[in-house]
């Protein structure tokens, strides 16, 4: 059950992002310009 590193793909497991002592990375989804399906990557939370 390895966690998903920052900026890595979490499309198939939205709750897999790694957590540190301070915060948990958030699986953030977007649609690349030519893509038919969304792409999700683990990102640092925006409010920090």
From Swiss-Prot:
Post-translational note: Contains 4 disulfide bonds.
Main subcellular location: secreted
Disulfide bonds listed in the record: 3-18, 10-27, 17-42, 29-40
Database matches in InterPro entries: Spider_toxin_CSTX_Knottin_CS (IPR011142)
Signal peptide region: none
Cellular component, GO annotation: extracellular region
Record's keyword terms, sorted: Disulfide bond, Knottin, Secreted, Toxin
Subcellular location as annotated: Secreted
Tissue-specificity statement: Expressed by the venom gland.
GO molecular function: toxin activity
Family: Belongs to the neurotoxin 19 (CSTX) family. 12 subfamily.
Domain notes: The presence of a 'disulfide through disulfide knot' structurally defines this protein as a knottin.
Record text on subunit structure and interactions: Heterodimer of A and B chains; disulfide-linked.
Name the UniProt record assigns to this protein: Toxin CSTX-15
Species: Cupiennius salei (American wandering spider)
